[in-house]
Amino acid sequence: MLRTRVTALLCRATVRSSTNYVSLARTRSFHSQSILLKTAATDITSTQYSRIFNPDLKNIDRPLDTFARRHLGPSPSDVKKMLKTMGYSDLNAFIEELVPPNILKRRPLKLEAPSKGFCEQEMLQHLEKIANKNHYKVKNFIGKGYYGTILPPVIQRNLLESPEWYTSYTPYQPEISQGRLEALLNFQTVVSDLTGLPVANASLLDEGTAAGEAMLLSFNISRKKKLKYVIDKKLHQQTKSVLHTRAKPFNIEIIEVDCSDIKKAVDVLKNPDVSGCLVQYPATDGSILPPDSMKQLSDALHSHKSLLSVASDLMALTLLKPPAHYGADIVLGSSQRFGVPMGYGGPHAAFFAVIDKLNRKIPGRIVGISKDRLGKTALRLALQTREQHIKRDKATSNICTAQALLANVASSYCVYHGPKGLQNISRRIFSLTSILANAIENDSCPHELINKTWFDTLTIKLGNGISSEQLLDKALKEFNINLFAVDTTTISLALDETTTKADVENLLKVFDIENSSQFLSEDYSNSFPREFQRTDEILRNEVFHMHHSETAMLRYLHRLQSRDLSLANSMIPLGSCTMKLNSTVEMMPITWPQFSNIHPFQPSNQVQGYKELITSLEKDLCSITGFDGISLQPNSGAQGEYTGLRVIRSYLESKGENHRNVCLIPVSAHGTNPASAAMAGLKVVPVNCLQDGSLDLVDLKNKAEQHSKELAAVMITYPSTYGLFEPGIQHAIDIVHSFGGQVYLDGANMNAQVGLTSPGDLGADVCHLNLHKTFSIPHGGGGPAGAPICVKSHLIPHLPKHDVVDMITGIGGSKSIDSVSSAPYGNALVLPISYAYIKMMGNEGLPFSSVIAMLNSNYMMTRLKDHYKILFVNEMSTLKHCAHEFIVDLREYKAKGVEAIDVAKRLQDYGFHAPTLAFPVPGTLMIEPTESENLEELDRFCDAMISIKEEINALVAGQPKGQILKNAPHSLEDLITSSNWDTRGYTREEAAYPLPFLRYNKFWPTVARLDDTYGDMNLICTCPSVEEIANETE
């Protein structure tokens, strides 16, 4: 009871210290919660864990398919053993020792779910009821960057719905990622072929953010001297909005011109202060700029070394001349229509391609071709020194997670259809669009076709006094069709691969066109205008010609996934990544048509299911974080950071404090923090950490005081990036508040807080959440992600809006920042995953995700501390526990020739993905097991690490066996075909089967250790053509 009273008083103190930032109503509400803590603190005892874990067999009404025992790895008896190993008898006592008393709040959660959570079948029934409230059977011809697609079932079942694909991590360990790397290389090849540019990345977040990256790349190439950027009037509106958001922090002036008025456009582009121009091709109204106009735009920009960027459509580019033909420097867009569902706006893989001289400036990850230790061709992520985890605030972009899973879907769609199949789809779309266009241009039709060129989109000025509202109403009520209202008397529509002749017949009826049969009998599939038609052969690599039968495609996908290590194989103990279970029940709804077939610009009354789900999820996340408001629009962690900082800046500007532009960031922070701050127009000032890993509060106070007039914010990860619960966090927050700054608490490590404490309880102003970490969205091999930002009440008016549709949850006003993503709710299709996870764990179960995550981490640390040095948690430290992750220090062995990367590679021979390598401290490994791993798996990993320590000792002692580390990993080919085993100093058995469990279940690295230097020095990031392969063979 005394402990609870102290906690309540500390909560009150926190609120009083933040009165300038929290409304009086919020303070009263918080006080009532603090009083509640005296009698209703969250129960995290071992007895409660047994109740949560075990089904209730006494009550016949209670379901047996409860979720917590499926999600949480250790059984109650395992928990007892683990606690005993560490000297504890109860989970509650363990947590009270681990989390500082001023941090441990244990405020009861108020989730909109049964206290013990839904069981699995209840969850599916509940979600189906919600999903059926969406109008998913309506035929959407809205377009504007989102289209109906047909996802081949062989790809849906064997890739999108396969845990071997969606539970893997970003392929930073290439020896166990060759399958995904090949699929991503296919994606890059598709993009490079269709755009005509030599270098493409492995995806970005969406078309709008890709456009923002193009603008900033153009700006940076000008050395930030050219402050004007030109955009075509006929750009998608959501892209314009994102561009305005990205431009503001750099004082870039966006100039909108009508590029179809080529003389006027060229005059504007000749201004030497213009860094670049972005054109939509085909345009949002469906029109296509003539070749000579595109060339004039390019020439005008190149005359003063500025860049032409083109936002394009990959499906259209199977027929259209590639933008590179006209001199484009950058081509970007969305690959969504290559089989990826609309999903109410995402996730979809954006693409980004550049000319050769920009290959080291391109944002995002690039897959390149290299070779391994044995000289075998292999794939890896290339040019990593560009990325934010290395360059920090000097990085080309803050992009981290992208859309790898969806890029793999899109590339597989292209592999399955091949070049002829893709062009047949495109010709059919064009033919059906032409039927409708010619009917509207007929003399008997009262309406006027605005665009005289097209691929799939038509814009129509309505006649006979008909309003857009009337026509849209008629289309929906009589034919179950959605169209797009451009203005009160103009509509547009876009056809896609799902469109049939019956659909076109209904559209003719919508426009009151008689004698439809005479138009429907026409075939325009071979009538694509010659002036626009590409003449080169596309997708020449053999991979796009070999797998067109379902059997061949099934085997190809299986062959790729068998080369990759995922959670289906073993634990992925990556620190700061939280590779927890992505349960089957959570994943099932994402391919339901009720969720996947929804266009993001459908009227709000047609998406009531999404509205109900989003509203409830937002309330739950606010309860978990202790905040008042939320935006689900950011679609990656880096995007969430950027959005939170932009919201802070908007709030400060509204108070007349535009001059506040300094962001304090600890030196231990993840590289996305300083990169995001720089993108938000903030000056990064580093704050030191002490030798024990904690934030240097004296340095923080000095820096805050030094920059008191310019201080905008501090970005702090909690628990810290070192995996520590620092007791001084509230003091740090008070320091920043006292000098007028806002506090951004990075939610990357939220998996250690849920139900125990929260950013809001600690006094922060804003945080982002990684839904792909704490809330069970899969990593997908590098995306998708979700990163809502949660804020205190004073920041709610500044949350991002959307320019095309109203936000169904009511956010958006005069103070709102412009969109940060193309879609109003970002990657909306994956939100049911987090929704289901929270609802199934329930108020009582969810805190145990954090409790067991920390139990697993500390158990592993206890087992390993006698064999390795543990950074910051040792006999020299006041901290005796880590949070949910810990750092193994290998730096002492470097002088003897052992690097952390040697241990990382050797773990592959034991069947494990390496922990986080060289971050946050070079020469270390950061380990995070998550709550989903059982005791058997934890012990297996610890046994592997202990065995590797013996190998380290051998190398340090100069014994030949120690070379096993330097040669790791060992592929099956190496073991069978290499002829130098007599001189290696160790046996094949020692290389492949160092521990007994590997004889029962062995995952083989596909290739030997890669040559990173060779890969960067000889950059190849597309599949070679058939001719190139033939030449190599000769």
UniProtKB/Swiss-Prot annotation:
Keywords: Mitochondrion, Oxidoreductase, Pyridoxal phosphate, Transit peptide. It catalyses: N(6)-[(R)-lipoyl]-L-lysyl-[glycine-cleavage complex H protein] + glycine + H(+) = N(6)-[(R)-S(8)-aminomethyldihydrolipoyl]-L-lysyl-[glycine-cleavage complex H protein] + CO2. It is found in: Mitochondrion. One of its GO terms (molecular function) is glycine dehydrogenase (decarboxylating) activity. The keyword Glycoprotein does not apply. InterPro entries: GcvP (IPR003437), GDC-P_C (IPR049316), GDC-P_N (IPR049315), GDC_P (IPR020581), PyrdxlP-dep_Trfase (IPR015424), PyrdxlP-dep_Trfase_major (IPR015421), PyrdxlP-dep_Trfase_small (IPR015422). GO terms for cellular component: glycine cleavage complex; mitochondrion. Its EC number is 1.4.4.2. One of its GO terms (biological process) is glycine decarboxylation via glycine cleavage system. Coiled coil: none annotated. Pfam families: GcvP2_C, GDC-P. Component of the glycine decarboxylase complex (GDC), which is composed of four proteins: P, T, L and H. Belongs to the GcvP family. Present with 12000 molecules/cell in log phase SD medium. The glycine cleavage system (glycine decarboxylase complex) catalyzes the degradation of glycine. The P protein binds the alpha-amino group of glycine through its pyridoxal phosphate cofactor; CO(2) is released and the remaining methylamine moiety is then transferred to the lipoamide cofactor of the H protein. This is Glycine dehydrogenase (decarboxylating), mitochondrial. The gene is GCV2.
